[in-house]
Amino acid sequence: MIRRGDVYLADLSPVQGSEQGGVRPVVIIQNDTGNKYSPTVIVAAITGRINKAKIPTHVEIEKKKYRLDKDSVILLEQIRTLDKKRLKEKLTYLSDEKMQEVDEALDISLGLHDEVKTQNT
């Protein structure tokens, strides 16, 4: 069963513009009820092209701890809904501590607790 925090290889093509594409690792960020019953999953792209997290929506993951080819960064500004058929192979699972970092970066990316939101109402 697909679970929140799982890292899979997924085929993200076709893409447009600055979207992350090709077969690459993604982390499942959808809740487990959705993962169980929906034909789709919500994921965030992972890249190995950035050595360090550059912005608050980036979360670093270490290759040794998570059995990846290289140190990588989860891009929480690159969120996509995929059909489960795009998921190829489960690579690893992120720790609860790392998922807490993912949640914090998601909060920033989606502006869930953004003070600007309350000022505009």
From Swiss-Prot:
| Coiled-coil intervals, chain numbering | none
Top-level enzyme category: hydrolase
The record ties this protein, via InterPro entries, to: PemK-like, Plasmid_toxin/cell-grow_inhib
Pfam families for the chain: PemK_toxin
User: Which molecular-function annotation in GO is an example for this chain?
Assistant: DNA binding
Q: Which UniProt keywords apply?
A: Endonuclease, Hydrolase, Nuclease, RNA-binding, Toxin-antitoxin system
The protein's Enzyme Commission number: 3.1.-.-
**GO BP terms, alphabetized:** mRNA catabolic process; rRNA catabolic process
Give the protein's biological function.
Toxic component of a type II toxin-antitoxin (TA) system. Ribosome-independent, sequence-specific endoribonuclease that cleaves mRNA, thus inhibiting protein synthesis and inducing bacterial stasis. It cuts between the first and nucleotides of 5'-UACAU-3' in single-stranded RNA. Neutralized by coexpression with cognate antitoxin MazE.
Q: How does it assemble?
A: Forms a complex with MazE which is no longer active as an endoribonuclease.
Name of the protein in its database record: Endoribonuclease MazF
Per the UniProt record, the lineage of the source organism begins with: Bacteria, Bacillati, Bacillota, Bacilli, Bacillales
